[in-house]
């Protein structure tokens, strides 16, 4: 029994190390994890897919920790290699950079756990995990940004290319929702294709 537990711990550590390495590559190699479509606006990211797969394999607690690592890379990129003023204004704030990513990993892990209950609908659970990893992150970034800049929205609104007088919340949804929808669809479609066979493979070890 001890050997079995030790093997499982070793496997968990190995899986975690591999996924952290993948996340770092996505975060810091240009156009791998972040793809800039419109200059000045936040890039579309494929990282929610990685978060969803990991969280589905390891559960909500590990998913939240992995999401926090993602948030830390976002914070670091905002200072070291921002792709525009919007990235600086949003993700140099630790609250906006960290909390949505942490929550995304946790939510994706909860959805991934449903696969154990939905034996005949496991792909649906993994698809939900992918959708949530992206949707929770996008929604929380929008809401927290509105909260942080509620009393002084002008600079962020102008950086997003909006006209004066518009609601900041509406501006944020307009600017970021398209990215969020694309990310959610991508993650929702691809997560089951990766997670299901990978989980079977890991169970055999």
List the predicted regions and their residue ranges.
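Loop-helix junctions at membrane interfaces
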Residues: 1-205
């Amino acid at each position: 029994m001890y050997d079995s537990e030790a093997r499982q711990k070793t496997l968990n550590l190995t899986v975690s190390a591999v996924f952290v390495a993948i996340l770092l590559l996505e975060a810091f190699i240009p156009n791998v994890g972040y793809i800039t479509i419109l200059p000045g606006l936040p890039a579309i990211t494929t990282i929610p897919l990685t978060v969803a797969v990991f969280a589905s394999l390891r559960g909500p607690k590990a998913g939240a920790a992995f999401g926090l690592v993602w948030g830390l890379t976002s914070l670091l990129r905002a200072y070291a290699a921002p792709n525009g003023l919007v990235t600086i204004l949003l993700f140099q704030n630790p609250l906006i950079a960290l909390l949505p990513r942490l929550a995304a990993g946790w939510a994706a892990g909860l959805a991934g756990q449903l696969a154990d209950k939905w034996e005949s609908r496991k792909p649906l659970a993994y698809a939900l995990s992918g959708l949530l990893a992206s949707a929770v992150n996008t929604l929380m970034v929008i809401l927290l940004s509105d909260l942080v800049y509620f009393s002084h929205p002008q600079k962020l609104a102008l950086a997003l290319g909006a006209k004066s007088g518009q609601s900041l919340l509406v501006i944020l949804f307009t600017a970021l929702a398209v990215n969020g929808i694309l990310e959610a669809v991508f993650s929702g479609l691809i997560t089951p294709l990766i997670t299901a066979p990978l989980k079977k493979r890991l169970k055999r070890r």
